């Protein structure tokens, strides 16, 4: 505000000009000051907590887990293929979303979130492995993790040791356990669920139109 005061014309040299500015000029000046204040108030980012990390890593799950793509993109045949194997289901991003929605209804969405986190981790550049490994471990594997996955003590301890000197395969053992759990437990129920069957029926009905 001090800079604005200095730049104003002196009143004794310009009589009658103090209130002569047009409303438009006043508004533009006010907007400029507000913009400056907004820029100064922008928060600085010093790092990501676990929740922010998860959102950035698997945004299509954290954004509400849509039940399907628009019907002109997703076909009934594609959805039918999801019933062939869990592998085919998870190979499709919409399949991941729909399955994630089902797991959320069963309060076990941490399983697919961990599986996806592991898939993302394998593609990570070497210099970023340590930081990402710690985030995944804290989010899913640690005994106090907010989204703790259901793995045995041996696998948990083994994973903890591996991330001390992380490699792209550090979470493979734990990921296989969770995949097997989803394949034998959640996946068969998913194929019988209203979430899956209603989606398939809707798409088949649209195909006949």
Curated annotation (Swiss-Prot):
GO cellular component, one term: plasma membrane
Tissue expression from the record: Detected in spleen, lymph node and intestine.
Gene: Rgs1
Record has Chloroplast as a keyword: no
Function: Regulates G protein-coupled receptor signaling cascades, including signaling downstream of the N-formylpeptide chemoattractant receptors and leukotriene receptors. Inhibits B cell chemotaxis toward CXCL12. Inhibits signal transduction by increasing the GTPase activity of G protein alpha subunits thereby driving them into their inactive GDP-bound form.
Primary location class: membrane
SUPFAM superfamilies associated with the record: Regulator of G-protein signaling, RGS
Subcellular location: Cell membrane; Cytoplasm, Cytosol
Native source organism of the sequence: Mus musculus (Mouse)
An example Gene Ontology biological process: leukotriene signaling pathway
Boundaries of every RGS domain copy: 85-200
Name of the protein described by the UniProt record: Regulator of G-protein signaling 1
Superkingdom field: Eukaryota
């Amino acid at each position: 505000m001090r800079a604005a005061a200095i730049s104003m014309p002196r009143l004794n040299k310009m009589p009658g000009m103090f209130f002569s500015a047009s409303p438009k000029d006043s508004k533009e000046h006010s907007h400029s000051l507000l913009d400056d204040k907004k820029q100064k108030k922008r928060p600085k980012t010093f790092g990501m907590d676990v929740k922010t990390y998860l959102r950035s890593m698997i945004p299509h799950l954290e954004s509400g887990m849509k039940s399907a793509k628009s019907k002109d993109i997703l076909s009934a045949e594609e959805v039918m293929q999801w019933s062939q194997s869990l592998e085919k289901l998870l190979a499709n991003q919409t399949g991941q979303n729909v399955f994630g929605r089902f797991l959320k209804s069963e309060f076990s969405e941490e399983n697919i979130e961990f599986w996806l986190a592991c898939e993302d981790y394998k593609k990570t550049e070497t210099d970023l492995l340590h930081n990402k490994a710690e985030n995944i471990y804290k989010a899913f594997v640690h005994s106090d993790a907010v989204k703790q996955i259901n793995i045995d003590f041996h696998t948990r301890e083994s994973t903890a040791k591996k991330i001390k000197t992380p490699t792209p395969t550090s979470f493979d053992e734990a990921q296989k356990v969770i995949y097997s759990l989803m394949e034998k437990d959640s996946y068969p129920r998913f194929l019988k669920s209203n979430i899956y069957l209603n989606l398939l029926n809707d798409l088949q009905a649209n195909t006949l139109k």
